[in-house]
């Protein structure tokens, strides 16, 4: 059990056999008769239940819902399978009406293009970040990263030149550029990984190699933060623009997360590997608890890291929340939406 973040804002539970309960104004984590951890509700923003075999009392759930503290349940691989949130967060009707209407006009197309270009720019900057100290120490790797970043920049610039009236008119072209960018990005990252690991490239669900397992787990933690930001902005997490709608698929969350995957999770995971931090999977292709603890701590610390945004330095979690609010403002025709581009 651990409290993570700069101000101990996130409680992470990842030990089988533990139970989360409420005592006065604190959440308490017990295993058998032992008290493992306490978290004051006053400072808490989120609870992550990161494995099976962990129980949560109804009193603890009620206290979190009353205070707007989101509880997210993750599989061992980091896939979010349930959220407990306050129903009051879904009460902004005007924003949701405009969000749905925007799909069939240029607002929807603008957002789809913005999410995709933001993703490509941030992938390019992640490669630049990994290359910036290698120009003299490892010139070949520097050139690999530089060329990859240039290629991603070219794709992003080409995306920005597409014109149309609705997202359905251009979705195939957008996804083509995004897919080409993904191939280039992951191929380049493979060459920049400084440790010997069995990694053939990016896999999502069902991955059993350590790199993809770490990425998937990190994305799961980020996903919970993005969904919370989307809901707090009054948006419907299931009505997206870039990702195709399917029953049970949170398309808008998957749209918004694209700008943040590379600067948050990719930077953490490849940083850990290249620093020699021990990460491994067990015989069943699962991340053991100690690796999940390391990843959760690193991702949440990264979200507390500060980046330049709107002419000031802000925590990444604050930037994420502001982007969601800018998105809500945009669909209501009250302001622009620009992608967050992380520095390097």
Regions found by a protein language model. Name each.
Residues 86-90:
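Short low-complexity, flexible loop/linker segments enriched in glycine and/or proline
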Residues 41-55:
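Extracellular/luminal Protease-associated
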Residues 77-83:
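Short gly/pro/ser/thr-enriched loop/turn and capping motifs at secondary-structure boundaries
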Residues 59-63:
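A short acidic, amphipathic alpha-helical/loop segment
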Residues 83-84, 249:
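Short Asp/Glu-rich motifs
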Residues 1-23, 32, 39, 66, ...:
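Active-site helix-to-loop segments that bind/position phosphate- or nucleotide-bearing substrates
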Residues 26-28:
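NTP/phosphate- and nucleic-acid-binding module
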Residues 47-49, 69-75:
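Short hydrophobic alpha-helical runs that function as membrane-insertion/retention elements
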């Amino acid at each position: 059990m651990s409290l993570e973040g700069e101000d101990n804002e996130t409680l992470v539970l990842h030990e089988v056999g533990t139970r989360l309960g409420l005592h006065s104004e604190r959440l308490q984590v017990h295993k058998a008769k032992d008290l493992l951890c306490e978290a004051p509700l006053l400072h808490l923003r989120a609870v992550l239940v990161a494995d099976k075999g962990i129980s949560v009392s109804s009193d603890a759930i009620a206290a979190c819902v009353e205070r707007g503290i989101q509880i997210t349940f993750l599989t061992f691989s980091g896939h979010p399978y349930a959220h407990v949130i306050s129903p009051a967060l879904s009460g902004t009707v005007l924003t949701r009406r405009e969000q749905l209407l925007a799909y069939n006009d240029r607002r929807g197309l603008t957002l789809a293009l913005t999410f995709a270009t933001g993703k490509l720019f941030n992938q390019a900057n992640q490669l630049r970040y990994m290359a910036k100290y290698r120009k003299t120490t490892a010139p070949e790797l520097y050139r690999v990263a530089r060329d990859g970043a240039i290629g991603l920049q070219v794709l992003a610039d080409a995306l920005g030149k597409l014109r149309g009236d609705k997202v359905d008119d251009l979705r195939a072209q957008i996804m083509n550029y995004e897919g080409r960018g993904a191939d280039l990005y992951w191929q380049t990252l493979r060459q920049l990984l400084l440790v010997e690991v069995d990694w053939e490239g990016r896999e999502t669900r069902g991955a059993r190699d350590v790199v993809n397992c770490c990425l998937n787990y990190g994305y799961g933690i980020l996903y919970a933060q993005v969904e919370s930001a989307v809901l707090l902005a009054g948006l419907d997490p299931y009505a997206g623009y870039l990702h195709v709608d399917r029953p049970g698929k949170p398309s808008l969350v998957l749209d918004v997360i694209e700008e943040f995957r590379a600067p948050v999770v990719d930077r953490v995971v490849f940083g850990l590997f290249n620093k020699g931090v021990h990460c491994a999977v067990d015989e069943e292709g699962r991340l053991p608890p100690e690796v999940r603890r390391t990843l959760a701590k690193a991702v949440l610390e990264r979200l507390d890291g500060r980046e330049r945004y709107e002419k000031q330095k802000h925590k990444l979690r604050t930037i994420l929340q502001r982007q969601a609010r800018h998105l809500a403002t945009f669909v209501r025709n009250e302001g622009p939406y620009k992608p967050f581009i992380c520095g390097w």
